[in-house]
Amino acid sequence: MSSLETQQPPLDAEMEKQRAELAGIIARNTGEDGSYATAIQSLFVSRHSHSHEFASVLAQPALCIMAQGRKEVRLADEEFNYDPLNYLVVSVSMPLSGRLADVSPLEPVLALRLDIDPAEISTLIADAGPLGVPNRPVGRGLYVERLDTPMLDAVLRLTRLLDTPKDIAMLAPLIRREILYRLLRSPQGHRLYEIAIANSQSHRVSQAIKWLNGNYEQPLRIDDLARGVNLSVSTLHHRFKAMTAMSPLQYQKQLRLQEARRLMLTEGLEASAAGYRVGYESPSQFSREYSRQFGAPPLRDMARLRSSV
């Protein structure tokens, strides 16, 4: 488990002032509850004033900053928390679930997300030359890092551009590049670095993850998957689990069940049709695995979700 288990010192006076300014910018650019694209490419801001049950999502690589409030994120059976003291980095696409904490209409969650293009990381590494990023054992593709002054300053300068839109085209790419550089230079930056290096084992695992994300409804043959990314079966299994906390088969199951739940909730599909759509041939197997994942069979789970909306 990776969470905020120990008491951390608060932000210093200057960082607290910057945090408050960041929260104000997000508040001005949201208005109502929801997540909003901005005039800056790949930058999203969000406001939420009510908590909810854990909601599933196929998260893409991103930097997530919390200006106000807290969010709990689950990867398999592990929990990660981030708040104004700590930011969250998703270094590789993976199925997550999350819920908001410390939230009320008077003090809504105010957050931003900056999507990360792995190709942009690769270009930055090539341009910057040796960054002195240490070689370390492969870790989760999701991590929490303490927010420091340079990172907060760069993020604040990026969001300030929302108030001066004429400056966005010239300055946003430069500040975005600075933010990515600071991520690479952070204590856990090796996790992004390893995935971005072509032909590294972590990069090959990320390619296997990408294939599963686009083909989860297909039968999974581990031998073929390993061969496709030029890894042995044992290496793929070991590194895949180290990165995602799941085996490839468990990962595929998560994707299938999350998508089936979405199909039933948003498109009104019956359980058997949703299960078939995501690759299940047996309705009874789908129902069993769905119940284990979400704590109730599909019909009861849908009734619970719809009543909470």
Identify the meaning behind each predicted range.
Residues 1-39, 44-46, 52-53, 135-142:
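A short, N-terminal "cap"/entry segment at the start of jelly-roll beta-barrel domains
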Residues 252-261, 300-309:
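Short, basic, alpha-helical segments at the C-terminal edge of helix-turn-helix-like DNA-binding modules
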Residues 35-132:
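N-terminal regulatory/effector-sensing and dimerization cores
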Residues 79, 219, 268-269:
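Residue at a beta-strand N-cap/secondary-structure junction
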Residues 147-150, 175, 197-208, 244, ...:
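N-terminal positioning helix adjacent to the helix-turn-helix/winged-helix DNA-binding module
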Residues 212-215, 264:
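Short helix-to-turn junction characteristic of helix-turn-helix DNA-binding domains
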Residues 4-18, 121-178, 182, 208-210:
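Amphipathic alpha-helical segments enriched in hydrophobic/aromatic residues interleaved with Lys/Arg
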Residues 178, 182-188, 195-197, 213, ...:
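Basic/polar phosphate-binding segments, predominantly the helix-turn-helix DNA-binding elements
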